[in-house]
Curated annotation (Swiss-Prot):
Primary subcellular site in the record, as a coarse category: cytoplasm
SUPFAM superfamilies linked: P-loop containing nucleoside triphosphate hydrolases (SSF52540)
Top enzyme category: transferase
Name under which the protein is recorded: Pantothenate kinase
Pathway: Cofactor biosynthesis; coenzyme A biosynthesis; CoA from (R)-pantothenate: step 1/5
Keyword Cell wall biogenesis/degradation in annotation: no
Catalysed reactions, semicolon-separated: (R)-pantothenate + ATP = (R)-4'-phosphopantothenate + ADP + H(+)
Localization annotation: Cytoplasm
UniProtKB keywords: ATP-binding, Coenzyme A biosynthesis, Cytoplasm, Kinase, Nucleotide-binding, Transferase
Entry's Gene Ontology cellular component terms: cytoplasm
HAMAP family to which the protein is assigned, alphabetical: Pantothen_kinase_1
Length: 331
């Protein structure tokens, strides 16, 4: 099913998408999108793309050419427009010696859909613009509550759900970033030990661009009973991207990745999941299916997928894990 059909119920053909005046998005096939690259140079090598991609993600240099160079050009236009508005506002307010705050890009989407690959590719491409901007990447993993807290609150089976994150810490971090503060600390997370690393931080020092990646970064919040207005994480974004795919495809990618990890990371004795390395394939498959059905699928349906229409750009992947359709919000 197409993005447009799922979001607003319009017919499936691409030609019809683009004629629908009530759609909030422009829709493009990957071939159409690739043409917007114009003269944007390819600044990555094949070996670099292989290094940047996550396990099971087949992205290659051709995919970078087809999708990411046009996206890099689009983001360059948004950053440039933001800079122009900043300068005009300073003139309006008669301000001088004011430093522009970082342009923040949010990237959301399900587990196993390829958010991390997209974030890393964009970080490299954006950092190689002629203007040589300073680009930082932070994920929400470090803002999860420590396992000890999740266990105490009986939330280990809800890890990755909105309530498993220290949302206050996320908001304080992004507030500091947008205030232009130097040396802002982002907590670190280890996928090996499956936990936040105490007293370990990434220092974010006034980048030109910050990429903030996580499954629930577009999540909205209910208004508190007392009526006090609470900001949402996405309030701090200048541009947002949602990585999309059919539910069945994400399921397949998740299970395949889990089985591959048994042959790699899970074999490390320090791995939280080391116990899964020595069980049979049948047992491992059953565990992977259970984790998908009872945790990740529920999170996708209840919390992640409903945020998709809030994105400025939706990248829809096909069965081969490559992007086949792009939806860009109209201005």
């Amino acid at each position: 099913m197409s993005i447009a059909t799922e979001i607003i119920g319009v017919p499936e053909t691409l030609d019809h998408f683009q004629s629908e005046s009530y759609s909030p998005y422009h829709f493009f096939s990957s071939e159409q999108w690739a043409k917007f690259r114009a003269d944007t140079p390819l600044t990555l090598t094949s070996d670099e793309v292989k290094r940047l991609r996550s396990m099971g993600d087949p992205i290659d240099l051709d995919e970078v050419r087809r999708i990411y160079l046009s996206l890099s050009r689009l983001l360059s236009a948004h950053v440039e427009s933001s800079q122009m508005l900043f300068e005009q506002r300073n003139r309006f307010l008669s301000l001088s010696d004011v430093t522009k705050t970082p342009f923040v890009i949010g990237i959301a989407g399900s587990v196993a859909v390829g958010k991390s690959t997209t974030a890393r590719i964009l970080k490299e491409l954006l950092g190689r613009w002629p203007s040589s901007p300073k680009v930082d990447l932070v994920t929400t993993d470090g803002f999860l509550h420590p396992n000890a807290v999740l266990q105490r609150e009986k939330l280990m089976q809800r890890k990755g759900f909105p309530e498993s994150y220290d949302t206050g810490a996320i908001l304080r971090f992004l507030s500091a970033i947008k205030a232009g503060r130097p040396d802002v600390k982002a907590p670190s997370y280890s996928h090996l030990v499956y936990d936040v690393l105490p007293d370990e931080y990434k220092i974010v020092d006034r980048p030109d661009i910050l990429i903030f990646e996580g499954i629930n970064v577009l999540q909205s919040r209910d208004l508190p009973a007392g009526g006090k207005i609470v900001p949402m994480v996405s309030d701090f974004f200048d541009f947002s991207i949602y990585i999309d795919a059919a539910e069945d495809e994400i399921h397949n990618w998740y299970v395949t990745r889990f089985m591959r990890l048994r042959e790699t990371a899970f074999r490390d004795p320090n791995s939280y999941f080391h116990r899964y390395a020595s069980i049979s394939d049948a047992e491992a498959l059953e565990i992977a299916e259970d984790l998908w059905a009872n945790i990740n699928l529920k999170n996708l349906r209840q919390n992640i997928l409903p945020t998709r229409p809030r994105a400025d750009l939706i990248l829809k992947k096909g069965k081969d894990h490559l992007i086949e359709q792009v939806a860009l919000r109209k201005l």
